[in-house]
């Protein structure tokens, strides 16, 4: 069996990706018609990716990226424009046009993380001696591509974020039909009536299993392949970004923007697998 080609970790904006981002900048953040010419935004975007990967403080960014205070100002400006979510949506849309989004099977799960600096949307983490933390709730397609992500205090139960997560898909979700149903896989944290009602309301077929409760046939084999693991795999990949592993941002919207950027980069990797090139 041929192995899937692997691509290096994205540390800077490729030419292809920059063309997509530049088009979005022209639409949502065009330069002013008067005043001094605007500085090149590409090094600034590279700096934001570097910070996402390393988790360094803004004032510790390498000098090659330019003035750190200017980089931070531009980042804050883009956060207010929801620009990182727009990049995510644009890349997901391109993948969908290439039939690279697997809507039939989806999965959702939550992920707890530390929040060192305080701020909004934090709460006592029940798995970390009640220290401050933030919860992320993620929805993925059938192979782990992120479709939506929301954040909340760490002490909010997963199932209480389910409806917000399903409402936050960054592109229009195809309407499920009897011929083309959509399935949603959830773990035991969603094994309650409220979650089942939400799943039904959003026209999914629910697959909520307790640990060790997978269906088996007469020979003791699983009837259906495990599908929930894809969201756990994506959460594990996101935790490799040191800027996401521990939240240092006091403003939740700044932390969410970095999560959105990481999700966008995952779709870009799928896009280059589909077209077979990266520059």
Residue ranges of model-derived segments:
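Short alpha-helical elements
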Residues: 1-279
């Amino acid at each position: 069996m041929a192995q899937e080609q692997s691509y290096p970790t994205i540390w800077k904006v490729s030419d292809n990706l920059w063309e997509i981002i530049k088009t979005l900048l022209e639409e949502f953040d065009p330069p002013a018609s008067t005043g001094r010419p605007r500085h090149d935004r590409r090094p600034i975007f590279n700096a934001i990716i570097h910070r996402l990967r390393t988790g360094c403080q803004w004032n510790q960014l390498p000098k090659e990226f330019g003035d750190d205070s200017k980089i931070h100002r531009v980042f804050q400006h883009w956060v207010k424009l929801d620009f990182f979510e727009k990049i995510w949506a644009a890349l997901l849309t391109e993948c969908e046009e290439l039939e690279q989004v697997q809507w039939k099977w989806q999965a959702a799960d939550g992920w707890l993380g530390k929040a060192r600096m305080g701020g909004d949307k934090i709460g006592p983490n029940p798995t970390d001696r009640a220290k401050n933390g933030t919860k992320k709730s993620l929805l993925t397609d059938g192979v782990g591509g992120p479709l939506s992500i929301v954040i909340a205090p760490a002490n909010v139960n997963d199932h209480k974020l389910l409806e917000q997560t399903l409402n936050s898909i960054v592109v229009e979700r195809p309407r499920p039909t009897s011929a083309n149903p959509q399935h949603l896989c959830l773990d035991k944290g969603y094994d309650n009536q409220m979650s089942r009602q939400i799943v039904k309301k959003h026209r999914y077929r629910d697959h909520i299993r307790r640990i060790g409760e997978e269906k088996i046939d007469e020979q003791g084999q699983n009837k259906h392949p495990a599908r929930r693991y894809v969201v756990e795999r994506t959460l594990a990949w996101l935790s490799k970004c040191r800027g996401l592993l521990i939240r240092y941002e006091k403003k939740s919207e700044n932390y969410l923007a970095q999560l959105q950027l990481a999700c966008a980069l995952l779709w870009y990797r799928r896009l280059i697998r589909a077209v077979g090139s990266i520059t």
